[in-house]
Structures are given as C-alpha cells and as structure tokens.
Amino acid sequence: MRAYLYDNLDTDCREPHEQNPSVPVSVEELEASGVLYWRLKDENFEDQIDKICADRNYKNRDQITVSKQGLGELFDAKIKTFFAEHLHEDEEIRAILEGTGYFDIRDKQDRWVRIKVEAGDLIVLPAGIYHRFTLDSNNYLKAMRLFKEDPVWTPLNRPCDEYPYRKAYLNVIEAN
C-alpha cells in the first residue's frame, strides 16, 4: 500500500495522479481519517483474514473480480459507479487477493488522498467517509469483500452531509 495526495488533474483516473513532488500520506494519517490497514503476511491470507473477521465481527464475505472479463458488458458502468464520490452506511472492507487498484478518500481538509492497493493489502474504510475506487492501468483486481452483516454494497453519492452516519463519522475524526 502506498498513499499520497492526489494531483486533481482531469486525466485518466487509472493513472497514478501523484503530485510532483510527491506528498506522501502515512498510515498514521490514514488512521486519523478512520482508515485501517493491514499487510497480510503471505500468499495464504485466509488465517489472517479469519482472525481480523473474528476480532472485528465480520460475519460474511464474498469475492469480486473487477475486470473486463469478470464483469463483461457491465464493466464500464461499474467502473463509473465505483469512481463516483460516495459513502456507505457500513464499513467498506477489502482484502486484495490479486491485481492492483486505487481507493481515493477525502481527508480532514477534504483533499483527495490516493491509496494504491495490491495483493496482500486489507483496507477498511469507515462508514460515512467520502471515497471512490478505480482500477489502475492493468484493469484487473480480485478482492474479498468482508461484511458485518448481509453482503450489501449501496453507494450514496455526495452530497450526503445530513445523513446520520456521515455526521457520526465527522464527530469521530474531529475527536482524533
């Protein structure tokens, strides 16, 4: 995982979009925004994922392959949906099994922070955080999606500032 401030240029979202000079963002800074990160130790991620699930009460999981082959005719529409700025009522938890991609989150100053993820990364985006996702130029990512309850992924596009989970999120990060 690598995190840095996004350059905000209006070019292909699958490009790195790293400012020049680069402005790195540390794991501690991500944590201040409520984002959690684990680096899974080896190719056999299952035991580590099971422990994280037990510790954090994640009850359900599934897998998604985000690629032209995996999504077929839905690929372009799904990528557009994933890249629209949104939030969720629940945490978004992803263990990256194969491939690479980018999660962009809004930091405390409402700047975009780009988080490059690859196989072996597990990331938790808190409920209420504005974010988006895209593949990189390899156009392939396979991830395990983890859920506290039923496997549901419902994006709520910005603006959602009046939603209770957005307000709860802002209260938590203000305290950090």
Locations of the language-model features?
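Surface loops and adjacent helix of pleckstrin homology
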Residues: 106-108, 128, 136, 146
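Double-stranded beta-helix
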Residues: 134-176
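N-terminal leader/capping segments at the start of a protein or of a new domain
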Residues: 1-61
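A short beta-loop-beta micro-motif enriched in histidine and acidic residues
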Residues: 79-93, 110-112, 117-119
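Conserved metal-binding segment of the jelly-roll/cupin
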Residues: 117-137
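Conserved short histidine dyad/triad with adjacent acidic residue
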Residues: 63-89
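Short Gly/Pro-enriched loop/turn and capping motifs at secondary-structure junctions
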Residues: 101-102, 110, 122, 130-132, ...
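Short, conserved beta-strand element in jelly-roll/cupin
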Residues: 87-107, 124
